[in-house]
């Protein structure tokens, strides 16, 4: 078993130590006796209330897949560790400006964003279509810009500029100023990584049609 799987299993056990009824009230979660349900980047997940295991489905759980590390760790962190009175500020900030940490992988000029920008370069139509498939709301500025739901209670903005003769492709992510009330700084990396993965999946589907 990989270190990632070990950590995920540890967190599933950790999840069971928390008050699930409080989670339900806090985030208005759909639930039944066996599961809690939550949407994460327009995909429905369920958390087993006895084992803590997280799975997702696109067919109302007739079939299901295990959540990967980024997905599971983000959901666990939000449900278990968000501040009691977390709330959106309704004010966008650059993800690299999160106040508690300077630099790191979420800095605007990090390899993380440069590499993602390269993948989108020359594919603005596909990127826009992917954002629309994820029910994004079109925004101003940038060659492509959309507000997307990370969670129903926590949107983000994806903004992209294509490369030209003077500048490389540029990807910018804006988050709510209070995002760290919902998750740890390190978890933001997992969440945005999953967001970009979902956008990439929808781009691939569009190009294959």
Predicted regions span which residues?
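Ampiphathic alpha-helical segments that act as solvent-exposed interaction surfaces
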Residues: 64-89, 176-209
């Amino acid at each position: 078993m990989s270190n990632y799987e070990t950590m995920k299993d540890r967190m599933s056990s950790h999840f069971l130590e928390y008050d699930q009824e409080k989670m339900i009230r806090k985030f208005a979660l759909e639930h039944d006796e066996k599961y809690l349900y939550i949407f994460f980047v327009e995909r429905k997940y369920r958390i087993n209330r006895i084992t803590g295991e997280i799975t997702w489905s696109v067919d109302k759980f007739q079939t299901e897949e295990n959540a990967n590390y980024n997905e599971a760790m983000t959901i666990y962190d939000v449900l278990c560790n968000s501040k009691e009175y977390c709330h959106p500020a309704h004010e966008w900030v650059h993800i690299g400006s999160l106040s508690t940490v300077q630099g790191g992988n979420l800095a605007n000029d990090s390899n993380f964003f440069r590499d993602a920008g390269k993948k989108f370069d020359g594919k603005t139509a596909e990127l826009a279509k992917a954002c629309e498939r994820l029910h994004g709301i079109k925004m101003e500025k940038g060659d492509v810009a959309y507000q997307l739901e990370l969670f129903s209670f926590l949107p983000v903005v994806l903004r992209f500029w294509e490369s030209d003769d003077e500048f490389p492709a540029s990807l910018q992510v804006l988050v709510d100023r209070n995002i760290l009330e919902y998750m740890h700084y390190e978890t933001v990396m997992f969440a945005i990584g999953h967001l970009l993965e979902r956008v990439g999946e929808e781009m691939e589907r569009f190009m294959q049609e």
